[in-house]
């Protein structure tokens, strides 16, 4: 059953057919209809693994199987670009650094059936051109050249990708190559792709501007950016498309409207036309139908917890981080919050120690829990207070 929000944001397509080339690669079963039965209109494209994220706070606004690992195809090139961006920030390379196009990169990139930027065997190419090739036209040959140049081999570069994914907390991610070419162990969830995209936007502005470029010319060949949001959705400025027979057509998209950023990820569509339709409608819905609500700021006190045998009787409970909840606008109007902890707390308690949770719930919203910490250090009670407490417990329990 499709969710109500999906039905609300997509229009029915009367006669959308996949391009002939795609149909040839991906044969599909055609239903047989009796002569007197009318053919029903084609359903609107239904993507898989949908994530809509608030790019400002990182709050997930909408999730459809968004935490399940999936084959990302070329969308995983976001991590390839991030590794290059890190090296630039660390001054290990510059945009003018040149890398050699090996036979391996040429044969498995430029001579492959996948996307490439027409690199020539044994040529020397600048990082500036290579990273544009990766970001704008999804060039596999550029990915391999960068991997070999930065790490010595693609396998060593993949180790850097996986290590970086762990550092960023992308728990679903496991990469086996720098290109996104099919491999059953090359996976990441759409939610983690959204987190990766958000990190790129915030920490690599010098590279992020390339994601909005509409075309790239190299070696006499001009290729267009395949991102269907660019030029069609107001404020769209990135990020990356992906497609293999295993993954279908997917998109990591981002746009800014009225000072607010939304990040969209989905996968599993059968054609570029379907990807365009779904991408435009979902991104528009992301701004029109979803919102965020700030519950508390980092360090804000939200309650107190009883303390047993402490230097004070209660511990102030404060938000460990900003607490922001996102979702459909109608759902946010009915939010409820309450504090839970296993009490009384036992001293000593360190300042910043997680001791409780703020529970946020409401009709139509999956219950969310956020850590609360002690706002100050609380030492143990002195011997007199402990003795007095012992006497109190003893006599209060006597009959």
Regions found by a protein language model. Give the residues of each.
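Bacterial N-terminal signal peptides that target proteins for export
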Residues: 1-7
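Short, flexible loop/turn motifs enriched in small residues
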Residues: 6, 42-48, 245-249
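Generic marker of residues within folded, mature protein domains
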Residues: 13, 40, 62, 89-91, ...
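C-terminal segment of classical bacterial N-terminal signal peptides
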Residues: 13-20
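Compositionally biased, proline/threonine/alanine/serine-rich low-complexity intrinsically disordered stretches
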Residues: 23-44, 328, 380, 384-391, ...
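Active-site-adjacent loops and short helices of periplasmic peptidoglycan-processing enzymes
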Residues: 24-194, 198-203
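Domain-terminus/edge residues, biased toward the C-terminal soluble/receptor-binding domains
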Residues: 170-174, 182-187, 191-399
